[in-house]
């Protein structure tokens, strides 16, 4: 049973990856290209400024690595094509397999729902904990946004926020189940929801805040990139409902 469910989950994940690739190509790549163009423009301006300063002072005052003219190890055509397709399909397959394993564990244990309803509720819970809550605190950024030296730190904070959100969801479900008999299903759901929301809000307030967006970075590009990220993740998790 679990083997069949795992295979089905991975196949659904591959489908989710293909759909997400389409969403990423249509919605995600345009703001990425504009962000890269912005980065190249900033580098070109920096190089020009450094060269002008060196001309006036008789020496070169700064050395700048020009990302715009340096040969890329992987071309943008490869990145937006086979690279993006491979990434979304592999990620989707792994996500689908993990979703199937978790579904097999929780089905029949968390409520009297049928398989499809359980899958839907699990997908919503996973979307909230693994993506939405951490992203609200630490949103996705396109190229040219962020400091290279803080990449590891930002990644660590994001995963800590995921762990907190998952723990908050587990506690919320336990509280809701404990309250259901005395308060009824509706009140128990509201209580569990309040526990989850309150917990993640408190955690978000206590976690470090990062603000690395350049002051002159186009706000529309940033918004488009983050909306595309939301659409991609939404596609992945919505498709996972087809697992059972």
Please describe what each predicted stretch is:
Residues 1-244:
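Juxtamembrane/disordered regions of integral membrane proteins
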């Amino acid at each position: 049973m679990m083997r069949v469910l795992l295979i089905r989950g991975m196949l659904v994940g591959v489908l989710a990856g293909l759909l997400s690739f389409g969403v990423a190509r249509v919605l995600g790549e345009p703001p990425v290209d504009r962000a890269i163009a912005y980065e190249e423009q900033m580098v070109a301006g920096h190089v020009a400024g450094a060269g002008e300063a060196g001309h006036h002072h008789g020496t070169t005052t700064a050395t700048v690595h020009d990302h715009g003219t340096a040969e890329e190890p992987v071309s943008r055509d490869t990145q937006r094509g086979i690279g993006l397709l491979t990434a979304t399909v592999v990620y989707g397959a792994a996500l689908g397999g993990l979703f199937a394993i978790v579904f097999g564990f929780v089905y029949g244990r968390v409520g009297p729902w049928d398989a499809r309803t359980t899958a839907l509720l699990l997908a919503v819970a996973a979307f909230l904990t693994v993506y939405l809550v951490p992203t609200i605190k630490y949103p996705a950024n396109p190229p040219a946004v962020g400091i290279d030296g803080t990449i590891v730190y930002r990644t660590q904070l994001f995963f800590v926020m995921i762990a907190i959100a998952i723990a908050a969801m587990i506690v919320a479900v336990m509280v809701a189940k404990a309250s259901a008999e005395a308060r009824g299903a509706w009140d128990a759901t509201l209580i569990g929801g309040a526990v989850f929301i309150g917990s993640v809000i408190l955690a978000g307030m206590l976690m470090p805040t990062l603000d690395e967006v350049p002051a002159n970075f186009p706000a529309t590009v940033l918004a488009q990139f983050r909306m595309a990220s939301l659409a991609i993740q939404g596609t992945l998790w919505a498709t996972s409902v087809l697992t059972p």
